[in-house]
């Protein structure tokens, strides 16, 4: 009899404890959500001309000039509080124009940036925000030659010939400022996620000379500056540990 009574009391009390535990966990998650930023993923493109480096290549028929576009991917975080918006991220870009067996060139870069903005709309589903920021972008330009006429035995027997078929690489890096505009939309069914666009301009504070692949300074090296327009599709969601409440 005592066992039966104990079992009944246990069955009555346990749901109450479970409910309190769920409410406590829900409260903790809501509190955590106020402080943790959202994760951002982006895909897009940027447009930039390197006139200084291209001018040097123009008179060398064995090399192809650099493209003025890059495809980009990004990963970062974004936080909105009291309509103030802050975000940080990493962006990689490439012109995707490399052909190892043909005369070609490619430009690629990695960038780090931090931005701040302000939501000018008082709307729960739509966010419109101008933003400004700073960052750093590191570039590598690679030039490939058509080596199809080079004989295999010549490469095998001559270190000079072997070195001559290597692609030519130059590096550069720029501290940059950023200014742009963002627009995002939240779904009523998924208010913790959003989809949106960012577009803007990135400029460098000064011109920088191109360096060797080992980042050595070179005499009479051409100089360029960043004057870049960009546009990105941005997907935003809360961190994975908060996807289920």
Task: For every predicted segment, state its role.
Residues 174, 179-245:
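Predominantly the C-terminal beta-signal and adjacent terminal strand-loop region
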Residues 82-160, 171-177, 187-189:
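Gram-negative (and chloroplast) outer-membrane scaffold detector with strong preference
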Residues 51-59, 97-105, 141-149, 207-216:
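Outer-membrane beta-barrel translocator domains and adjoining extracellular loop/strand segments
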Residues 19-82, 234-238, 245:
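Short glycine/proline- and aromatic-enriched beta-strand/turn motifs that initiate or cap beta-hairpins
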Residues 60-66, 101-105, 119, 166-172, ...:
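Outer-membrane beta-barrel domain signature
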């Amino acid at each position: 009899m005592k066992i039966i009574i104990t079992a009944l009391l246990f069955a009555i009390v346990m749901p109450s404890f479970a409910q309190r535990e769920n409410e406590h966990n829900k409260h903790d998650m809501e509190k955590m959500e106020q402080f943790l930023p959202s994760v951002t993923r982006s895909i897009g493109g940027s447009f930039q001309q390197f006139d200084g480096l291209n001018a040097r290549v123009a008179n060398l028929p064995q090399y192809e000039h650099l493209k003025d576009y890059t495809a980009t991917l990004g990963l970062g975080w974004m936080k909105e509080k009291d309509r103030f918006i802050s975000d940080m991220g990493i962006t990689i870009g490439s012109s995707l124009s490399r052909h190892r067996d043909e005369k070609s060139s490619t430009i690629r870069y990695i960038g780090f940036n931090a931005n701040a903005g302000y939501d000018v709309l008082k709307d729960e589903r739509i966010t419109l925000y101008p933003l400004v920021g700073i960052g750093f972008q590191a570039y590598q330009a690679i030039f490939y030659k058509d080596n199809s006429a080079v004989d295999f035995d010549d490469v095998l027997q001559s270190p000079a010939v072997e070195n001559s078929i290597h692609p030519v690489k130059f590096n550069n890096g720029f501290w940059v400022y950023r200014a742009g505009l963002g627009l995002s939309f939240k779904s009523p069914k998924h208010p913790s996620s959003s989809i949106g666009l960012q577009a803007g301009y990135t400029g460098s504070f000064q011109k920088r000379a191109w360096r060797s692949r080992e980042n050595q300074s070179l005499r009479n090296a051409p100089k360029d500056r960043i004057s870049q327009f960009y546009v990105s599709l941005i997907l935003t969601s809360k961190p994975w540990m908060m996807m289920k409440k």
